Amino acid sequence: MKTILVSGTSSGIGYEICIQALELKYKVISVSRNSKPLENIKGIDCYSVDITDNDQLKNLVEDLKSKKVNIDFLINNAGHLKNETFDKTSYESFKQTYDVNVFGLAQITRLLLPLINKSGHV
């Protein structure tokens, strides 16, 4: 059975990717700040993780390593976007967007690389 890890799964595209992957008989690992939407679906392993928090990411990877998880597909779907015009966007909002969309995605990928099968895909 192939394993897929998807970030940003509490709603929208990430949520639907998990549901579709489960229907295709993948082992599904969901990573999201809010894991509640998928927690009660049998066959989906949910992790509540803020990808901007390096300690939480390290704990996630250590847990997956302890369970001897090998990842075949990594889908970096987590993202942050505020519906604001450029001139109204605060520094904090820009920073949060980059922390999630750039640094968080890079860090989760970097930390998960040892668990991704040689034939795996990011």
Where are these regions (language model features)?
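The beta1-alpha1 cofactor-binding region of Rossmann-like NAD(H)/NADP(H)-dependent oxidoreductases
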Residues: 49-59, 91
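N-terminal Rossmann NAD(P)H-binding glycine-rich loop of SDR-like oxidoreductase domains
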Residues: 10, 18
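Conserved glycine-rich Rossmann-like NAD(P)H-binding loop of the short-chain dehydrogenase/reductase
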Residues: 24-38
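Conserved NAD(P)H cofactor-binding loop of Rossmann-fold oxidoreductase domains
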Residues: 77-82
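A hydrophobic alpha-helix adjacent to the NAD(P)-binding/active-site core of NAD(P)-dependent oxidoreductases
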Residues: 46, 89, 97-98
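A short, exposed helix-loop element centered on a Lys and neighboring polar residues
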Residues: 109-110
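Substrate-binding pocket helix/loop in short-chain dehydrogenase/reductase
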Residues: 85-86, 93-95
